[in-house]
Regions:
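PRPP-associated nucleotide enzymes
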Residues: 1-166
């Protein structure tokens, strides 16, 4: 991808994180959310702040042996109205994993809230598009290594940021 979005430039500031999460929460206020869930790492902060704004419980998923799961005694009771939150979506893979966890638990997904959707709305995770809200929508191309123009030019993307690109 020719663009990198560093979420922690914003998330390091609690007042901005709170403001963004309140805006995200407002978009789902009428959905009677009972639980907010996000994937580790950035999703933990978002779930907490959105849950606080909605007055609900907030939990997170994490990988165990490569599989996204609920740990630490977290549970989703069948029928619980769940809002999934994530910081940045490129392919939708992490959100899809959280969707799977919620579905396996019998929860009802009422929405997916994103800070940034880099897929231009193309990421699919089994949730109807009308239930997905992003504060910022971008259309950023994502390449397989063999198709990447930077890779073809010999520019190794091994570090975050763009300081090594000339």
């Amino acid at each position: 991808s020719p663009m990198y979005v560093e979420k922690f430039n914003v998330l390091q500031h609690p007042k901005y994180t709170e403001k963004l999460c309140k805006e995200l929460a407002e978009r789902f206020r009428d959905q009677n959310v009972e639980l907010v869930i996000g994937p580790m790492t950035g999703g933990i902060l978002l779930a907490h702040e959105v849950g606080k704004a909605l007055g609900t419980r907030a939990i997170f998923t994490e990988r165990e042996k490569g599989v996204m799961t609920l740990r630490r005694g977290f549970k989703i009771e069948p029928g619980t109205r769940v809002l999934i939150v994530e910081d940045i979506v490129t392919t939708g893979g992490s959100v899809q994993e959280v969707v799977n966890v919620v579905n396996q638990s019998g929860g009802e997904i009422v929405g997916v809230g994103l800070l940034v959707n880099r897929s231009g709305g193309k990421a699919e995770f089994g949730v109807p598009h009308e239930k997905v809200q992003a504060l910022l929508n971008l259309e950023v191309p994502t390449y397989k290594p063999e198709e990447c123009p930077l890779c073809k030019d010999g520019i190794a993307m091994t570090e975050r940021g763009s300081k090594h690109i000339k």
